[in-house]
A protein has these predicted regions:
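Conserved histidines in hydrophobic membrane contexts and catalytic metal-binding motifs
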Residues: 1-409
């Protein structure tokens, strides 16, 4: 057992990562000279994930370029773990890190991080609900008077917190709740899946041939794609293929032949693959559920455009396989990439409680990226106004309390 590493141009086992191999790998990512290499024995802000501890020590490479480029390489196999520049790290501090609470000491403990985010967002939901309750009560009392005003508050921060809360309070609540649901599982009392989580995908990726049994030699792939930075061995059931990645693109190469050509899974092998999920799960007393396959030429609610995730690669047409099982399963399998999306009742609940509310992936907006982003920007700016005015009121309240306490003494 274990992992074997080979040189890309031979079948000779590669020794442990040495200086020459490290510098050669780094040059693939950035052509600038290396100014410093740090050997890390603990995680830092840009590699905060616990699963990376097995890659220790990790080499952090600094490049002499104006962009402030940094590269993290595993000492175990030379794999690139992180690649970033100064601008990306700056925006991460303003975006991903506070949004996801990606602080190293917390994020490296996955269980603690998950519970922390769930509890913080749950507390946030309670706070927003309380604010909406107060807003409704004030609105009701204000409009009972003889001379009703839109806002009863004269003080600036109170006025703008009240006004922004009226327009954006519900969005702040749904955004906070959906953020919690990004990590929380759908309770089994709502729906208990008939298939174990991930079992369908594991079945479709089972029966993989050994790397040395791929008809297409990986060295021929390297020769055809000299700009490649990474090659992955993949399979759809018995059908082998490679994923070749360079700096900007991904290429899916059929490995069932001795000559490189784009992957194209047939309708028959996709249908047989889905059938295998249910033949492997059933016992002798059970029947295989009804399965229907159709060719989808357009995006729909549960199969949306995710071009950014797949480096702009076209995701249509796709095979849609509908199964008459207790989970109301639908499989979307892209023949040119082998990418599988499995939708069942639980994932539909997840979609409406997280994706739809948090990313505005709603019918009518999914098909128009510009409109969706515009709506999202307006709502996020409004939600930011609610938060900023709320924080200002809280700071002013604490300041007044501290001043009163000082006067007493």
């Amino acid at each position: 057992k274990g992992t074997l590493h080979f040189l890309a141009d031979s079948t000779i086992s590669r020794p442990s990562l040495d200086s020459e191999h490290l510098h050669r790998t780094a040059a693939l990512w950035c052509s600038s000279p290396i100014t410093r290499i740090d050997t890390l024995h603990s995680l830092d802000q840009w590699i905060p994930f616990a699963e990376l501890k097995k890659e220790m020590p990790i080499y952090k490479i600094y490049f002499a370029d104006d962009a402030g480029t940094q590269l993290y390489l595993s000492s175990q196999n030379g794999e690139a773990l992180q690649f970033s520049n100064r601008s990306e790290r700056f925006w991460a501090w303003l975006g991903a890190i506070p949004h996801w609470v990606y602080f190293t000491w917390l994020r490296q403990d996955t269980v603690l991080w998950t519970k922390t985010v769930i509890w913080l967002t749950a507390l946030g939901c309670l706070m927003v609900i309380a604010g909406i309750w107060v807003t409704v009560d004030v609105w009701r009392k204000t409009h009972r008077s003889r001379h009703p005003k839109f806002s009863p508050y004269r003080k600036r921060w109170y006025h703008w917190h009240y006004v922004s809360g009226i327009f954006f309070g519900i969005f702040v609540l749904t955004f906070t709740f959906s953020g919690m649901m990004s990590l929380a599982d759908i309770p089994e009392w709502i729906h208990k899946p008939a298939l174990k989580k991930g079992s369908a995908t594991r079945t479709l990726h089972a029966r993989a041939p050994q790397p040395e049994d791929y008809p297409l030699d990986y060295r021929r792939v390297i020769a055809a794609y000299p700009q490649a930075l990474q090659i992955e061995w993949r399979n759809f059931r018995e059908h082998p293929y490679y994923i070749v990645k360079d700096r900007k693109n991904e290429y899916y190469i059929d490995a069932a032949d001795s000559l490189p050509r784009p992957l194209q899974l047939s309708e028959e092998e996709i249908l047989k693959g889905v059938e295998s999920i249910y033949t492997s799960q059933r016992d002798s007393s059970q029947h295989i559920p009804g399965i229907r396959i159709s060719r989808l030429e357009h995006f729909e609610t549960y199969y949306r455009d995710m071009s950014n995730m797949y480096r702009g690669r076209p995701q249509l047409p796709v095979w849609k396989i509908t199964v008459d099982d207790p989970d109301r399963s639908v499989y979307y399998i892209h023949p040119e990439t082998g990418i599988i999306r499995h939708v069942d009742t639980s994932s539909r609940w997840k979609y409406w409680s997280y994706t739809a509310l948090h990313r505005m992936r709603l019918p009518g907006l999914n098909s128009n990226a510009t409109l969706r982003k515009t709506v999202l920007w307006v709502l996020l700016l409004g939600g930011t106004a609610v938060c900023i005015t709320g924080v200002a009121l809280s700071v002013n309240y604490i300041r007044r309390k501290c001043c009163k306490r000082q006067k007493r003494y």
